[in-house]
Amino acid sequence: DILVNTNRILKQRIEPRRFMTCVLLRWNNADKKMYYTGGGHEHILVYHARERTCEAKQTGGIALGMVPDITKLVKEEQIGFEPGDFVVLYSDGSTEAKNMQGEMFGLTRLKSSVEQHALGGSPESVFTSVSKDFTQFVGEQVQEDDITLIVTQRPQ
């Protein structure tokens, strides 16, 4: 309902051909599970501490503001989110950022960076280390898009 109502209001208030992507995460303390609903946003990265792997989950859905009603396009999915696991959210400016040679940072590099730094780390240390990898990759190249990175962890 949140994305459906947000889309309805946004569609009425923004200029044609404008839109917004998003992903909505919801933690259910009763069943100890994380749920997400996509609004055409980037993948969600989930680092599974037990397996020491990082998984990219497509968020699905459609960007908000593109069509008047997204009721039939909104679907809530579940994320496996065990104690010690991380969820990483990011904007497309993070993966599409280019270095001086024009090469994009990309999803594969972002996943690898999370995998490398998550083991035994905290959300703060993972954020700092991934940000450092990103900064070293892009160097002095000016970026034209926003670069957003959010890291959260389910406590042990």
Residue ranges and their predicted role:
Residues D1-Q156:
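Conserved subregion of the PPM/PP2C metallophosphatase catalytic domain
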